[in-house]
């Protein structure tokens, strides 16, 4: 596996990541047991980056539970996405962030991204300031 260094955080991150959008268990999608196997295999292959999002139904909870069951949270750089179109004020950022920490069963999120930034809801100065506060 090739790795890159994030110049801002200094994190050593795998050149390939695992997108977890299809977890969990919708028809034809991996169930929790299969998600565990996929995440475990990815880490064995040197992947250190997992990507999830608030807007993927049940996804953050599935990924968080898998990382907890497998004991892999400290080996992973975890990214999730804020549903920015649902944020109307800075307090919404706090609410979503806290909910996402709970779903992911973690005390921190390594990379917190805005989801669907091309939506018709403009990214306001308030949004950016709230996001900056969480950084």
Predicted regions and their residues:
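A generic structural signal for short coil/turn motifs at secondary-structure boundaries
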Residues: 25-28, 52, 86-88, 120-122
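Short, acidic/polar
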Residues: 30-41, 89-103
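Active-site-adjacent beta->alpha loops and helix N-cap segments on the catalytic face
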Residues: 61, 121-125
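Active-site groove signature of glycoside hydrolases
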Residues: 104-120
